[in-house]
Amino acid sequence: MSSPKFDSYDWENDPNWKEFTGTSTSINKLKEEYFKKNIDPNYKSSNNTTTQRPSTSSSSRTSSSSTSSPRATRAKPTFRRFLYGAWVIAQISVILFTLFYFISGNPYFFYKALLGATIAYSIPIFNTFEGRKPDRALAAQLVQDENAQFVFYCMIFYFFGSSSLVYLLPNFIYSFFHMLKIVIPYTSSVPFIKNLLEKVNSTNAKAIDFAISVEINIVLIAFFGIFSSFSNILLVFIYFRYLKLRYQFSQKIKSKINEYSQMVDQLSAHPSCPTFIRNIIPKIKMVLSR
C-alpha cells in the first residue's frame, strides 16, 4: 500500500497527532515533523519556498525599542543645541533692538528688545528647572533665581513702563558681554580684532557695576518721572518691590545699595547739609527698609 500524501493526510482523526501537538502554535511545522517521523521518512519540507511573516515576538519589540532608544537619546542633545542657538539669537536681538531704539527712538524696538531679553533669561530657567512639577518649593527657588528676577524686570517695563533707553541699558550690557565672550575665540585669525575685543572685555567688571547702578537708580528715575508724566505710581511701586527682591537675593545689588547708603550718610553728616534734609533721610531709609 502506498504511503499517504502529506496534503491529503487526515490530521484531525489521528489521535497520536493531537497528543503530539499539545498546546503548540506552530501547527504546520509540527505536522511536517510528525509526518516525516511517523508516516513518510522520505518527505521533504517545503518551508524553503514558504514566505514567513515578520515576527511580532517580544524579542522583535525589544529590538525595535532598542533602535528607537538612541534616537531619543540623540534628540536631547539636539534640543539643547536648539536652545543654545535660540539663546544666542535672543542675546543678539537685545543688542540690535536696543541700538535700533537708540538711533530711531521708535518704541517698537524698545518692546522687541525687552521680549528678546525675556527669551534670553527664560532659556536658562528652563534648563535649570526642566521636568520639575509646579509646587511651592519650585516657586521659592524661582524667586531666588537671578534669571527669573530679570524676566520680572523685563515684564515690568513691557507692561507698565514708557519706552526709555535707560530701562534697556542693564540688559544691553549683560547681552553685549555674553556675546563678546562667544565671539572672541573666533577672531584668533585676526589678532588686531581679537586684541581689541579682549580690551573691551577687560572692562566687564566695571560695565556690570554700571549696569547694577542703573538698575538701582531706575527707581529714582521712575519716581521723579511721575511729575513729568514719564512714569506712574504703579510702576514705581512694582519696581520698588522688585528692587527689594533683588536686594534680598543678589549680593551685588546689596553691596551697591549699602555703598549708596553710606554715601548718603556721609553727605547728611556734612556741616553744609541742611538740617531738614539731615532729619528726613533717616525717616526715608526707615520707610524703604520696611
From Swiss-Prot:
Which cellular compartments is it found in? Answer: Membrane
**Compositional bias annotation for Low complexity:** 45-72
The membrane topology noted for this protein in its Swiss-Prot or TrEMBL record is: Multi-pass membrane protein
A Pfam family hit: TMEM33_Pom33
Residue stretches spanning the membrane: 83-103, 109-129, 150-170, 218-238
What are the start and end residues of every segment in region (Disordered)?
1-22, 39-72
A Gene Ontology biological process annotation?
Answer: endoplasmic reticulum tubular network organization
Give the UniProt keywords, A-Z: Membrane, Transmembrane, Transmembrane helix
Where is it mostly found? membrane
One annotated Gene Ontology cellular component of this protein:
endoplasmic reticulum
Similarity-based family: Belongs to the PER33/POM33 family.
The name this protein goes by in its record = Transmembrane protein 33 homolog
Identify the species of origin.
Dictyostelium discoideum
